[in-house]
Swiss-Prot record:
This is Indolepyruvate oxidoreductase subunit IorB. Its EC number is 1.2.7.8. Disulfide bonds: none annotated. Keywords: Oxidoreductase. Gene3D superfamilies: Pyruvate-ferredoxin oxidoreductase, PFOR, domain III. Heterodimer of the IorA and IorB subunits. The keyword Oxidoreductase applies. It comes from the Archaea. It is an enzyme of class 1 (oxidoreductase).
Length: 196
């Protein structure tokens, strides 16, 4: 089975760490996985995306229209991912907004969240949105937002990795002093996705 995951957001949200955790969880299960990453101006909240391809795939770039899952850490970044989506795609959207640096100086306002949601719903098969920032704060730290999103991915029908595999990879890749907060965030993200 092949499965394509497009992860997008802005610098500082833990996009790459999340992708490494997914990739290493797949490798531990002896599942072929390839990954590519694109860094924007991460120190200024620039766009960051990774493409994770699991299974018997050729190349690290997801062809347009072939993302099974789009894990969008920021709403406007989900719009940038539209070409990767199809009517079969699942989208998990963090609804908390981080206006891009260039938009703060632009006369064009940040699009309303309901417009972003409508655009995504027109393109993808399923869109589940929730405020992952609030969930991360309740779990104990804003920086656990990426684990909220990872938990939501694990709750997605058809996701090829079990929660136990992801948690094992989390333990290998996250500081031990923060593992409890991150585990809470993961479980709360799983619950939020299951409810949305």
């Amino acid at each position: 089975m092949n499965y394509n995951i497009y992860v997008c957001g802005v610098g500082g949200q833990g996009i790459i760490k999340t992708s490494v955790i997914i990739g290493e969880a797949a490798m531990k299960k002896d599942i072929n996985v390839v990954m590519s990453e694109i860094h924007g101006m991460a120190q200024r909240g620039g766009s960051v995306s990774t493409e994770i391809r699991i299974g018997e795939v050729h190349g690290s770039i997801i062809p347009d229209g072939e993302a099974d899952l789009v894990l969008a850490f920021e709403p406007l970044e989900a719009i940038r991912a539209l070409p990767k989506m199809s009517e079969e795609s699942e989208v998990i959207l963090n609804t908390s907004v981080i206006p891009p640096f260039n938009l703060m100086r632009s006369p064009h306002p940040y699009p309303p969240l309901d417009e972003i949601m409508s655009t995504l719903e027109e393109r993808a098969g399923s869109v589940r949105g929730f405020n992952a920032e609030e969930i991360a704060l309740k779990a104990g730290h804003i920086l656990s937002l990426n684990m909220v999103m990872l938990g939501a991915a694990a709750a997605t029908p058809g996701f090829p990795l079990e929660s136990e595999s992801l948690i094992s990879s989390m333990r290998d890749n996250l500081p031990s002093r923060l593992i409890d907060v991150n585990l809470r965030a993961f479980r709360d993200g799983f619950g939020a996705a299951a409810e949305s």
